């Protein structure tokens, strides 16, 4: 009987998520039979999300791509035929070689995002460097605006160990919905609330995390920076600040103090459309508990004013001295883990063109650049779902001579490909994972062989590299020996066998972030006034508030036709666009609309509605709810056009943040009408 019992292996989820959960995986007869949280993990302590529970459905589901495919018919129609790996690689080799000779290596756009975290995906650069160059993108879809803003202000992006939230007396969630996007931090929030902590929620809607909130504030979309400056004004005016901390550990306070005088409560209330008594209430809560934890989410930094907004919000923690102490602090992400080094990198070629911002991928590719983009290699990404203005992106991609996509599924992006290469799942290759919700480094173990003819990208590049005659020493096999070399090259004080059993935490890790009160800024202090903001980004060194684009004040002509602000947030059953096609997790696409807005348009609950603007349109099911204010419609991001016939990025514009080259998805006006 013992021989038939499944073996239990430990691994880590590599998805682009705060969790980076440690997993216990049962494997029997070469197949995964069950996935659960590792009960001995210091982070998730046995907890995993609904997506993690459904990993076997992803690995073995009928949607999985198993063989190389070649397009037949027109691009985008999703019609393919099965071909061999030799045929696929030969077609790719000949076309890439021809394009390199005719236009130069920069004619190939290599596009890679963060479907999986980890270090071994750097094998791609070992190939493209030997190719002689390529075109790449810069900026981000997710958090680049906030990361840059916090680095400019504090010198590092880090926060206390999440369990320290249980010591908090006051917790403020600002544009954050951890019940859906960070269940481990939510666990500790709930424990703090059960012990008597007050919970305040600031969001454009009533989210799933705020069910126990003592106070809800719903600002007009994009006005969070104004609200933060108004709160700062009141904290200073009412002396709810830590003068000693400010004097010793901050720079530019006097200039900041003058700035916030321009944000009296009446003006802030009018701008944010938050009733004055509610703003006064949050001041009173902070007065009662000036040492508080402020958890800032991704949502506030998806506007064109994102960087200055995050700077303003983060500085509220500095005003009351809520930095470097237990039970308080500013939480965005925790980047204390040391960088993992890829020791197999060939010399970097000169002909790398880093010229296209991710936020403007479509128009950036469409611009008259020399040489023009003629081919696109896409892995770990689904831009036809995840990037803005996908109708334009589709038109641009249709002009390309070659599109290669490596993926597990027939995504909207894969449907655009000439050649699809079937990729390995996280259980089918080795990797080292660092996350951003905690600072542990964990070994991702290989537990099963890839099904069909699926391969990890390292093997794809190795096979293609052979055809080009590249040095394969720079394209190592995915093996324990490769992982050991990465560990040694990264100066980690651990061994492979040890990593199989437990996560690694670097000795420099701070359980209480900034507990030493050292800040890696030019002034060695927290910077209210940051000269680098002006030098790098050409923006005001102080975190001033500017109205974002595409709203009723900055775009009255657009607003007159499309008067509803569309906000898209992340769901509990999808990871960006991943898991959208898994049958058990599928849902009918919907949109929240306030009953007042619905009534004026003759829309009833559950009816089909057309959501549209000048960029595109789609049909969703209307859900009438008071959880969104009039003038706002809300839904969750990640539906595929090929599966759900509903891709929200048909509607979004190519807007970029003030700082950090972030993508401003939330600057999006739409109109809604009943489908007859």
For each feature predicted by the language model, list its residue ranges.
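Extended redox/cofactor-interaction regions of prokaryotic respiratory oxidoreductases
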Residues: 122-190, 195-202, 209, 225-229, ...
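Phosphate/diphosphate-binding loops
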Residues: 12, 18, 392, 398-402, ...
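Acidic/polar loop patches that form or flank catalytic/metal-binding clefts of enzymes
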Residues: 33, 136, 242-243, 279, ...
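Active-site phosphate/pyrophosphate-binding segments
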Residues: 231, 250-361
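Long, contiguous, secondary-structure-rich segments that constitute the structural scaffold
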Residues: 451, 456-502, 577-591, 596-676
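Short beta-alpha connecting loops at secondary-structure transitions
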Residues: 211-219, 439-450, 584
